[in-house]
């Protein structure tokens, strides 16, 4: 199914996200025939470029990042245009009116437009107001949608303020708050796994699940983003958005139907059901960390405080581990252990569902644990671990696995996260985009952690290349549990 004819306006078109993610995603959608031929992309930034210069820059980015053919590349780039605008000056937005009028006429888009704010967060409240000053937000002539990148706010208060600013000029149905984790195939498949298989859903509750682990690990440090990262930290960069959204997908109730309202209703219910964090939780169920210099694979890697752009006395966390609970009928008493960090041993995001053991150990006190491992990235996969008899005499149980890898699906056309989400936005499907009530509930949940850190809460050190502070191991060990150390789930079929 192709999209409506439309014009895609990218604010921040000279930035890294546009070059690495947005234009490649649009190119691939075009290449596989998912975009209508009647579409245009208008790049907007302060840089003084013209259409041809912009096309050449995007062409270079595509050749560098994607598999291209000259014919498809030329055809796609012919849809790219550019307009220099001072994005902080409302009057300058008047330049967009004749450009968009021309593009709507040329591509017969009926006025359909979506705006992508690939800009610093400081402009998230400015751009909608400036668009509205020239009538570019109204839906009298075609639909108008606006995509907001994370972070949506800096804390609970600023998120509320930003919401008010945007809602002055765009209605909720026009606003698409993007979280690229929700565009990943395995996250979506989690819902199908749960709600289309009769053998999982009856077990998906406090009666059969012992605890849940969610890990979002990055092997790199802050790279060249030290200045930006120091203002966000692991809490704002990963935990409040990506990992809480994944947690909600694991814990949500079955929606009445698969559409934007029903799905997002259930996500919001989970966010509102998270047990509020107390001062006792700050001491017993939370670990914040910061990586220090260490040798990794024979190379000495910098500690966080030595990274470019990071103040020497920074208390920004590069690691967080939290034990949280959901106060509802399904999950009462089941701990969710969530962790994320930079400079860990591997880049991996996965969910581990730990099922309870049998009531009585018939075969062995050390029988294998039943686990369902859902790998979100890299190498998207699902693995079920359980016990079977070890060959030979006796009845010793041995762990075996049943595995599924997306890469093994012959001919599978798996869209990247940005491809899927851009396609959904053009179709008007907001199912995988965050809604305002869930965003505010997530900020409300994490606000005590932000306050704890601001008031001098402890930041534990951990060596780069390790799985985080020792305190994080002690946190989960309090209940006799250990963090799974992610490794390759399964070997590739040959």
UniProtKB/Swiss-Prot annotation:
- The source's domain of life comes to Bacteria
* InterPro entries attached to this UniProt entry: G6P_DH, G6P_DH_AS, G6P_DH_C, G6P_DH_NAD-bd, NAD(P)-bd_dom_sf
Q: Does the keyword Cytoplasm apply?
A: no
- Per UniProt, where does NADP(+) bind? 46, 150
Q: Which GO terms describe its cellular component?
A: cytosol
Similarity comment: family membership? Belongs to the glucose-6-phosphate dehydrogenase family.
Enumerate the catalysed reactions: D-glucose 6-phosphate + NADP(+) = 6-phospho-D-glucono-1,5-lactone + NADPH + H(+)
Q: In which pathway does it act?
A: Carbohydrate degradation; pentose phosphate pathway; D-ribulose 5-phosphate from D-glucose 6-phosphate (oxidative stage): step 1/3
Q: What is this protein called?
A: Glucose-6-phosphate 1-dehydrogenase
Q: Which EC number applies? A: 1.1.1.49
**Would the keyword Oxidoreductase turn up in this protein's UniProt record?**
yes
Task: Please give the function described in this protein's UniProt entry.
Answer: Catalyzes the oxidation of glucose 6-phosphate to 6-phosphogluconolactone.
Catalytic residue positions: 242 (proton acceptor)
Give the enzyme class. Answer: oxidoreductase
